Amino acid sequence: MIEKAIIPVILSGGSGTRLWPLSRESYPKQFLSLDSHSKKTLLQKTYERLIGLEGLENPILICNEDHRFIVAEQFREINTDPQAIILEPVGRNTAPAIAVAALKAINLGKDPLLLILAADHLIENIIEFKKVIQSATTYANQGRLVTFGIIPTCAETGYGYIEAK
């Protein structure tokens, strides 16, 4: 079986309201460095933690129109040329962003595996993270849809849990 390339799709369309006063609508948390040991931002770390994965290609980035120059500059700083920066005129959440990224990959003449990533996640165990991705690619190369995440420690309505009253 031919192994497909992996194109990371990095979603960085957050509004910057959850980490106020550090982040703002004009400069959401994904564009901040929250690590005292590194000047890299959450967005930059999202891509850099993937380096070394077999079949990795440069990313497709999705962001708010207002953040396009921030995104481009942050990738210039890490010497990475995105395949595309897709601008959202209005945030419509995850599913439409993923659909547009898939269409962009097709328009680039590719049939890759898309690795959908949020730009604002903190992932400490990068070695284990890469192992999980490599394992997932085995199934995805067989035509399966693969999702992964963490076991939640509590219910949070901001992540889709329904609060009964």
Predicted features along the sequence, with ranges:
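Short glycine- and Lys/Arg-enriched binding-loop motifs that mark or flank ligand-binding interfaces
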Residues: 9-12, 154-156
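Basic, gly/Ser/Thr/Pro-rich low-complexity segments located predominantly at protein N termini
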Residues: 18-21, 163-165
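Conserved core of the sugar-phosphate nucleotidyltransferase
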Residues: 126-165
